[in-house]
Each structure stands twice: as structure tokens, then as C-alpha cells.
A protein has these predicted regions:
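One-carbon transfer enzymes
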Residues: 1-256
Length: 256
């Protein structure tokens, strides 16, 4: 499986995630390779992304860059319209990544909204920090919505990137209870900030394992993407591949 990796490379987490995926490729857990890394920043724009680029090069992975900021300043005025700008920008991105023929692209800390053409041409997946059917928005908005709705479970999902933000078909997901003994006393408090932080801590601990296990499952054919539908190993249509148990095992290993 040829994997295209999209990342702005804006922080340490971006480097850690790439390292985690690359380690899984090298160990044979992910049956494939990272064919290229694309970034919407270019060398010299920011210290953190420069560190990210150094890591990519150290892995001998082809690095493709197109600065969205510089693209804005070098194109005509009508690119001030966000939708038109995204279309033209991502058409240029496509020209640069097309030769790599990725089977799958993952948005791993990519801070731009992908235009419709690109996400229809390639199977692209993204992480959303909520259970399937859960709240949309940022991770902060998701957690406050879970608390407000007195939800029983939290989690995260990997979904297909579609024009409808955070609502593409669910590829995989993991769930965990937020009503057990660990959480109970914080639900009873008027100040829900500790509960908020606790839910975030447990959700965040599951993000990297969910991402790498999803890539592993896709590379092994345990779950597949066919014409925008999610299929299991028997060829049956499913509403997402439940990786909760495997993710929990990874979380326990990482805590040791």
C-alpha cells in the first residue's frame, strides 16, 4: 500500500506521529510504505516545520512542499475567495503528488481544508476526536458537547475525507467509557474542568494507536475502502471497523 502523508508539520506531535507510523512500516506491522510527505509549508517558514522536514529527509521519504501562504501572494486577486483559492491551490498540489500514485492519503496534522476534487480523486482519511455519530468541531468543542449531553462514551474515529467536514464514512473507531469509577466523582462536581481534562487525556492517548492500527488494518485487507464505502475482510459493507480492544492494548503498552 502506497501511503501519501499530508502534514503541516507544525509541532512535535506531527514528528512523533510520523515516527510512529514509520516504525510500524519498518517492523512490518503496516504492509506498505510512506511514498511521500506533503506539506503546505516550505523550508524557512517556521522552526517547527523545518524540524519536521529534517525528520522526513532522515527517513529518505520524498518531501513535497507548496506554501499556501506564498501561493496566496503569487496568484491573482480573485484567490481571496477561499473556495476558489482552495480549488486552485489543491489542483497544484495534485500535479505534484500524482506521480507517486498513492493508494491512500492520510491527513496527519494537515491544517488546510482539502478541496472537493482532491478528496474525490484519492481515498483520504482523517482523525476526528469523537465517536461515530458524535459531536463535530474541534476537540475542545467535542469534549464540552459530550459533557453537556452527559454521554456514556467518548472516543475517536478515522473517517473518509469528504466535502462535508467531519462527516465522511467512518473507516475505523475506538470507544471508551467516561462513566466508570475513574470518571464518576468528576461528573458530580459543579466544576467540570477536571472532567474535561481527564476525558482529553484518555482520548489523546488513543489517537496515535488508532491511526497506526487503521493503517495496519487497511494494509492487511481487514478493512477496505471501495468506491467511498467501507468494506470488511468478507466484502460486507460496514459502518466502521471497531479497533477499541486493539487500541486499548496499545495504550496499556505505552503506559508501561
Amino acid at each position: 500500500m502506497n501511503i501519501g502523508w499530508f502534514s503541516t508539520g507544525r509541532d512535535e506531535a506531527a514528528r512523533q506521529l510520523l515516527q510512529a507510523a514509520r516504525d510500524k512500516v519498518r517492523s512490518g506491522n503496516i504492509n506498505g510504505k510512506i511514498s511521500f510527505v506533503f506539506s503546505n509549508r516550505e523550508p524557512g517558514e517556521a522552526k517547527e516545520s523545518d524540524l519536521f522536514f529534517e525528520l522526513v529527509r532522515s527517513y529518505n521519504i520524498p518531501l513535497v512542499c507548496l506554501s499556501h501562504k506564498r501561493f496566496k501572494t503569487t496568484k491573482e486577486e480573485d484567490l481571496g475567495i477561499k473556495k476558489e483559492w482552495r480549488i486552485k491551490y489543491h489542483r497544484e498540489v495534485n500535479k505534484r503528488i500524482e506521480p507517486f500514485a498513492p493508494d491512500l492519503c492520510i491527513l496527519a496534522g494537515y491544517m488546510l481544508i482539502v478541496n472537493e476534487e482532491l478528496c474525490q480523486k484519492y481515498d483520504m482519511i482523517n482523525l476526528h476526536p469523537a465517536p461515530p455519530g458524535g459531536p463535530t468541531g474541534s476537540w475542545q468543542e467535542v469534549i464540552w458537547a459530550l459533557i453537556e449531553n452527559e454521554a456514556d462514551t467518548a472516543g475517536a474515529m478515522m473517517h473518509l475525507v469528504t466535502p462535508e467536514l467531519d462527516r465522511g464514512p467512518v473507516v475505523s473507531y475506538c470507544l471508551f467509557s467516561i462513566k466508570g469509577e475513574l470518571f464518576a466523582k468528576y461528573w458530580r462536581k459543579d466544576d467540570k474542568n477536571i472532567l474535561f481534562r481527564l476525558i482529553r487525556q484518555h482520548e489523546l492517548a488513543r489517537e496515535f494507536p488508532l491511526i497506526t492500527l487503521t493503517l495496519q488494518s487497511l494494509s492487511r485487507g481487514e478493512v477496505s475502502i471501495k468506491n467511498g464505502k467501507i468494506i470488511d475482510a468478507q466484502g460486507k459493507l460496514i459502518s466502521g471497523y471497531n479497533l477499541s480492544c486493539k487500541v486499548d492494548e496499545e495504550v496499556k503498552k505505552n503506559l508501561k
